[in-house]
């Protein structure tokens, strides 16, 4: 392996079918994004929108999970992250299926002529407080650039009637987000509470909303078993992606 390739591998995350470099992105590859990309329902989808794609992780995971006819639009406001996402996608098996748009999604969505049957986002969830090291990090971590109401409104403008809008959030933030979504006419259809171990309280929640009403299916996912190895449930969900699972 060349020195440049070795450096690249240290600045990113290697999955079974693709590599994600993230050294120019404010938010790195992490468990939240991997959970969301593996969990989001993809049956029957034809058009996917990834809001705030960052390194392109979610777009790449969804490309792996769907067939060749599915197209994915990935929108990212930060130009450095968008460029890195484009590079990651160009080196993946699916460069023709994913298009990166360097733009504010609120300006991009009104120009679209077709709706999406899956919209996905790993959104910011911190209120502005402690100052971040860079404006890019602040944009990725705080809700000041695209708050949750604006995110819900934007998704509602471009989703199909049967579509799903999926997010991952901290447990308490997710509960607040859900109440806000319900008040805006969304319906909660899927919810998975995520705990690190069986004995711990959930710390993350995976949520899928739809414009159409219907039964809400809820479950719980534990990441690690008593032996601190990945649980059967987490392994089943993510083993198509993790290199050594």
Swiss-Prot record:
Gene Ontology CC: one annotated term: cytoplasm
Keyword ATP-binding: no
Intrachain disulfide bonds: none
Catalytic reaction(s) noted: adenosine(37) in tRNA1(Val) + S-adenosyl-L-methionine = N(6)-methyladenosine(37) in tRNA1(Val) + S-adenosyl-L-homocysteine + H(+)
Cellular compartment(s): Cytoplasm
Keyword Cytoplasm among record annotations: yes
GO BP annotations listed: methylation; tRNA processing
InterPro entries listed in its UniProt record: DNA_methylase_N6_adenine_CS (IPR002052), SAM-dependent_MTases_sf (IPR029063), Small_mtfrase_dom (IPR007848), tRNA_Adenine-N(6)_MTase (IPR050210), tRNA_adenine-N6_MeTrfase (IPR022882)
Catalytic EC class: transferase
Residue ranges that the Swiss-Prot or TrEMBL entry lists as coiled coil: none
Keywords: Cytoplasm, Methyltransferase, S-adenosyl-L-methionine, Transferase, tRNA processing
E.C. numbers: 2.1.1.223
Domain of life, per lineage: Bacteria
Gene Ontology MF: a single term: tRNA (adenine-N6)-methyltransferase activity
Function recorded in the entry: Specifically methylates the adenine in position 37 of tRNA(1)(Val) (anticodon cmo5UAC).
Database matches in NCBIfam families: tRm6a37MtseTrmN (NF047853)
Annotated HAMAP family: tRNA_methyltr_YfiC (MF_01872)
Family to which the UniProt record says this protein belongs: Belongs to the methyltransferase superfamily. tRNA (adenine-N(6)-)-methyltransferase family.
Protein name (database record): tRNA1(Val) (adenine(37)-N6)-methyltransferase
Source organism of the structure: Citrobacter koseri (strain ATCC BAA-895 / CDC 4225-83 / SGSC4696)
């Amino acid at each position: 392996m060349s020195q440049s390739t070795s450096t690249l591998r240290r600045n990113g995350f290697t999955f079974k079918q693709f590599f994600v470099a993230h050294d120019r992105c404010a938010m790195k590859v992490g468990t939240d994004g991997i959970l969301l990309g593996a969990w989001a329902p993809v049956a029957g989808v034809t058009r996917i929108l990834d809001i705030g794609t960052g390194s392109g992780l979610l777009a790449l995971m969804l490309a792996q999970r769907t067939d060749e006819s599915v197209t994915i639009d990935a929108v990212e406001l930060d130009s450095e992250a968008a460029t890195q996402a484009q590079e990651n996608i160009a080196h993946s098996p699916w460069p023709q299926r994913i298009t990166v748009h360097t733009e504010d999604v609120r300006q991009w969505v009104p120009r679209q002529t077709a709706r999406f049957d899956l919209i996905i986002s790993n959104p910011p969830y911190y209120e502005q407080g402690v100052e971040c090291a860079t404006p890019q990090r602040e944009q990725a971590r705080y809700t000041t650039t695209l708050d949750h109401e604006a995110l819900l409104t934007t998704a509602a403008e471009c989703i199909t009637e049967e579509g799903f809008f999926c997010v991952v959030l901290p447990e308490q933030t997710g509960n607040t987000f859900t109440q806000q979504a319900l008040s805006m006419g969304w319906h909660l259809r899927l919810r998975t509470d995520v705990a690190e171990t069986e004995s711990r309280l959930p710390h993350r929640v995976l949520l899928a909303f739809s414009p159409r009403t219907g039964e809400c299916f809820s479950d719980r996912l534990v990441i690690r078993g008593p032996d601190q190895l990945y649980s059967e449930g987490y392994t089943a969900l993510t083993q198509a992606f993790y290199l050594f699972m």
